[in-house]
Structures are given as structure tokens and as C-alpha cells.
Amino acid sequence: MIFRIYIKNKMNNEIVIVAAKRTPIGSFQGVFNNTTAVELSTVVTKSVIEQISIDPNEIDEAIIGCVLTAGLGQAPARQVSIASGLSLDTGAITVNKVCSSGLQSILIGNDMIKAGTANIVLAGGMESMTMSPYLMPNARQGYRMGSGEVIDHMFYDGLQNPYDQHLMGYFAEQTSKKYGFTREDQDLFSIESVNRSLRAQKSGLFDDEIEPVVVKTRRDTTTISKDEEPEKCDIDKIPSMRPAFDKNGTVTAASSSSISDGAASLIIMSADEAESRGLEPLAIIRGHKRHSQEPEWFTTANIGAIDKLHKKLDWNKDLVDLYEINEAFACVTMAAMTDLDIDHNKLNIHGGACALGHPIGASAARILITLIYALKANKGKRGIASACNGGGEAVAIAIEIP
């Protein structure tokens, strides 16, 4: 009987998020044009350690998403771990699940703690799309004559479907056609995303989640403390922008997520561990689900992941206070709103990637962090974050504010 009670208590022990921070998001070739993904991640990793005053040697595992690893050096997550002062005995895993990488890292950490293979996990994501290199695939054999092929690592490994070589935006166009989303529909969604992010910036709603980054300039240093992209956007020009992927299409740069740089980190542990340390959890992880389908329909994979999560937890849209669904394209989030009947007033309330930017290895962790602080600011309790990814998949996580 005692053994049964012990097993039940172990199985029911909740996993909690005790610290969460992100960098500001930098525009492509913007404020972080000379800052590597490892450097960005190190800043927020040190920040979350300081947030709860934990000894970094006590962290068992560092799990960090990163998609564009070429040129970063061996084992980027391990580099962050060592640079952030974690023990040499701390394990490190670099996760590549394309745009879901940052969230998948957290889910791996969650499951490791539940399995008893780790007590405290640092998880998150990082990306410098600006510093992703060009690749010369035939250089090893030698370019003997004529012009040689040079491949954009960012496009080829981050933004391009390997099965037919179409860019992700091609499939956004197909999604818009399927759902009947007009150019105006998508423009209005994107404009609202920008306006929401600007309001959040001006009212200080991002302040608690952002860790400023000090960058070197030619003559001095400067501190970056807010997302770069929203203030650069000229809303008046959005309706006249050219289609980005099809000359007769409806998807533009404005209704697509911006190429960006940034990082996000969280610390998770069991509720018992947090209590023993006197730490107040930011959020409880209630569950997570994955959904996979045809690669060309990654745009609607969030719908399946969220629906599965609703059913797993016996939740529904009326029981969830806020949603964060990554705005890879406006139509991705609009499709989820349509099929799941989610009110836009409870979705991406501080704007999304169409306004803020989408550093692909970090964004999924970023939306979870934004969700946590948005729930707290609005006195909400339950939230779901979901991110789709190339290959036709999506992951979703449910949290509850204690």
C-alpha cells in the first residue's frame, strides 16, 4: 500500500516553470547583426539563473533549440551551457524541430524530469538568421570550371520544403486559397498584430519578459531593450505591398513573419523541487501534444495539436483564457482561429511574429514566455501555446498560472 502511494505521488508530481526570459527580437541585419545565437542565448540563460538565484551547477541538462547551426561550431547548446557557467557535468542537447524547436526543448525537459533522469532543466531556443552562412556543397570535390552553386543556409535548412524545394510562403498561398482568406483579410490581421505589439511595447507589457542585451558598436556599446521590428513597420504601406511568393497571390512580407534574431530561456523543475527551494512557480505545465500531417500542410498542423491537447485535458476554447499561436504567416493563425473558433481577442494579444519577428529556433519558446507574462498581466489562469513547423508538424503546450 505504501509503495502504491509513493508511485502515485511520483506520477502526479507537477512540472513547473520557475524562470523565463527572452532577448529583444532583432531585425534581419539589424541590432544583432554581429551577435551570434550562442551569445544571445548566453545572455538570457544567465538571466534566468539570476532570476531565481540558483546555483548554475545544480542544473542537470541544457536543452536549446537551434535550426541554423552551420558555422556556429560544434554542439551550440553545450557552448551556451559552458559560457553561462553551468557545470561541466551538465548535459547539453541542441534540438532542431525547425520552428517548433524552442518549444520541443521544453517538452523534452518536462519529460526528462517526469522520467527521473533530471531534476532541473534549462530549456529554450536561439537563432541568428542574420549570421547564417552561405554553403558551397560541391567545394569539397572542387569547382573545376564554370560557375559553382552557392546555397543560402537560411533558406535551404530553415525556410524551404525539402520534398519539392518550395519556400514556406508557397504553402501559405495554398492555405489562403483553401480558406478563402483575401489579401485584405491578411493585411488587416497583420496590421492588428503590429498595433498590438506597439501598444504592448509602449505600455511596458514586454518589460518583465525581456532581458536587455548589450552589443558592441564601432565606438562604444549600446543596450538593446525592446523588439526592433514593430517600430520599423510603416502600416500605411501594407495594403500596397507586392505579393511575396506569387505575383497574383495574397501573401506579402507584411503577412509573413519577419526574418529575425533572438533567444529565449526557461528553467523547469518539479513542483516538489520548487517548493523545497522556496520558489514560486510562474506556471504549471499541464500537458502537451504533437500533430503531424502532410509536409505541405504544416500551416494547419497547429489545429490538430491544439485539438488533441483540448481533448487530452478535457479543456475547450471557453476554458482557456489566452492562446499564443506562432504567426509564421497571418494565414496560419487565421486558419487556427477559424477551425477552432478562437476569439481573436484572446489570441496573440500582444501581437505575434508578423510584427515582432520569427527567429526560427527561438520563437516557439518565445511565445510560451509571452503567454506566461500575458496571463499574469491579465489575471488569466489557463493558456495554450502552439507552433507549427516545416515537415507538416506542430507542438502545443498547456499551462496554468498557480
Where do the PLM segments sit?
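Conserved catalytic cysteine-centered active-site region
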Residues: C66-I120, P162-L167, K232-S258, D339-L371, ...
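Condensing-enzyme catalytic core mediating Claisen C-C bond formation in acyl metabolism
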Residues: K10-T35, S47, V150, I235-T300, ...
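Active-site pocket-lining segment
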Residues: F171-E173, E209, K216, R286-A355
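N-terminal extracellular/periplasmic Venus flytrap/periplasmic-binding protein-like
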Residues: R22-T23, N34, V38-V43, Q51, ...
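Conserved active-site "lid/cap" helical segment
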Residues: M11-L72, P76-S84, G91, F171-R183, ...
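Active-site-proximal alpha-helical scaffold in enzymes
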Residues: K97-E127, S176-L205, S265-D272, M337, ...
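Flexible glycine-/small-residue-enriched beta->alpha junction loops
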Residues: I120-T175
